[in-house]
Amino acid sequence: MSDLRTAIERATPRRKRWPWVAAAVAVLLVAGGGFALTRGDASTGRSATAGAPVRGGTLQFALIDYQRSPDPQWGTNYAESLIGNNITDKLTWQDPDTGEITPWLAESWEYNKDLTEFTFHLRKDVTFSDGSPFDSEVVKANFDQYVHGDEKLGINPNGAILLPGYIETLTPDRYTAVVRFEKPLASFLQASSFTANAQPGFLSLSTLKLSAEERTDPKKVIGTGPFVYESWQPQVKTVLVRRKGYNWAPPALKHKGEAYLDRIVFNTIPEASVRTGSLTSGAIDATLDVGTTDEKPLADQGFKIIYRGVSGTSIFFNLNSQLFPTDDIAVRRAIQLGWNREAVRKTVLTDSYSVATSVLAPSVPGYVDYSGTVLRYDPEKAGRLLDEAGWKEGPDGIRVKDGKKLVVKLLGISNLVANKPAYESIQQDLKKIGIDLRLTVVPIPDYTALLTKAKTDWNIVAANRSRNDPAVLNLQYGPALGNGSYVTKDSPGIDVDEVTRTLGALELTLDPATRKQYAKAAQDLLLDKYALVNPVYNPSQVIAHADYVHGIIFDAQSRNHFVDTWKSNGK
C-alpha cells in the first residue's frame, strides 16, 4: 500500500478500513440547516487566488468515484469527465457565467442560416503529446468515430445522442473543418465545448486506431491537453503529469504556457468520512464530493469551500408514462405536489445546493420558475387529484385502485451525497397522501445494470443531465433521443408528435429571444401539460481544499480544470 493510502487510513482510526479494491459507494448523510461559508469565487468558475502562481508540486485530489476507462470519449461518470478534461481539449470554451461560446482549439467559426453546417478555423500551433499535429483530418476522424463508433474496435457510438443527424466533417484545407448535419442543430456550438460525460475531447489518430481494450493502457491514450497520463489503477487512483510545451489554454482563462502543477493524483475514496479525515490530516490537498454535513466543520477549520451548481437539468424524477401507476397523470401530478420542498432545503441541502424550481437549472438560458404553480407544496390538491382519479385510501393508508396498491418504484444513484436523504424526505411526504414510494438507490455500476429494464421495472428513474443549453431537454426527453419518460403513441393522453415538435424546436434557432420562448414551451409541456418530470434539487459540485491551493477552475458544466491550479508551497 502506498504512503498516501497509509496516511489516509491513519486519518480515520475509529472507522473500519476501507477495502480499496471494492466498488465506490458513498456514505449519504442528512445535513443540518443552511449556513454561510467562507468560499472561493464560485461565480467566476474558479477558486480564489493569492499572489503570483508558484510552479511545481503534486496535487493530491480525492473523488468518490473512479475511472472505468482512460478513454475520455467513453466516460460515464464525473471522475471520468473531470480527468478527461485535463488530458484533452475542445474546439470551443463556454463561459461559465454568460454561456457565451468562445475560442479554444478553433480560433473562429461561422454557420449557415439553416444551422446544418458549421465551419471551424483551427489554431495552427497545437500538437498532441506524441508530437503529432492537430488539424482538420484529426477533427474529422474524431467526430466520425465519436458519433458512429467502430464495431470492429469495440468502440461505442458515444456521441450519437449529443450530435443527432451528424453526416460528415469536410476538410477543405488543413486547418478548416466543416461539420455537417442532416437537420438543424442549434446546440452544436455548445456541444463543441461539452465537457461532461462522453465528451468530444480530441484524441490522436494513433489512439483512434486502438480497440477499447487497448485504450485501457493510459499511456496509449493521447490528447492535446495540459496533462498526460502517468498511470491508472482502477478503483484506486489515476496519476497525471504536466504536458511539456502546452501553450493553448482557452484565451478566456488568460493562462499562458504550461500548467503550474507537476502532477495530479486523483485518489478514489468512496467513504465521505475518509475523504474528510484525509483532508484534515494533510494526506490530501483537496476533495470533491464533500458530504453535506462536512461543509461547515471544514470551513470552521479554515478549509476553503468552493462550489458551482451543475448546469443542465435538476436532479429529477423521470415519470414513466408507460408503466402502472405512473401512466396515470393524476399520480404524476400528485407526486409533483405532494412533497415539502422547504423541508428538503432545511434538512438535507446546504447553501451549496438549492431546491429545484424547474427541470432546468437556473443557470441555463430560458429557465422558468414554477415554484408558485405546478411545483408548489399542496398535499390537499394532490389528494383531491387522486380521489378524483379513483384512488381510494386503503386500511394501511396506501391508496388502492381496481385492487392494485399505489406503489411507485424509484431507481437512483447513491454517488451524489444529497440524493438518498432527499428521496427519503419525499418518500415520507408521499406516504402521507397515500403513495408508497419504494427506493432503490445504488452506486453507478449497479444503477447502470438495473437501468436496462427501466421501461418495464421502474416508475421513476432519478437522474440529471449536465449541459448548459436548453436543448438538454430535447436530449433528455425527445422521443427519438433520450425519451426519459418513455413517451410513445401508447402513452395515455400524450400526443407524442407534440412532444417531439415542442422539444425539437430548441434546435431550430440561435436567436436568444426565440429560444427563450421555445424553452418555456418545452418546460410547460414537461412540467404542466403532461407532468412527465418531478424536479427535486439543483445539484452542485462542492470542493474543499487547503488554503495553500489556488486556481481550481469550474467550467460551464461544473467540471474542473487544473491548468491554472497551483500550491503556495510548490510541493
Predicted features along the sequence, with ranges:
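Ligand-site clamp/hinge motif
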Residues: R215-P218, Y246-P297, E424, D436-R438, ...
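Detector for C-terminal structural segments
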Residues: S2-D3, L29, Q233-K237, W339-D369, ...
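Aromatic- and charge-enriched surface segment that lines or borders ligand/interaction sites
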Residues: S108-L153, R174-V178, P325-D327
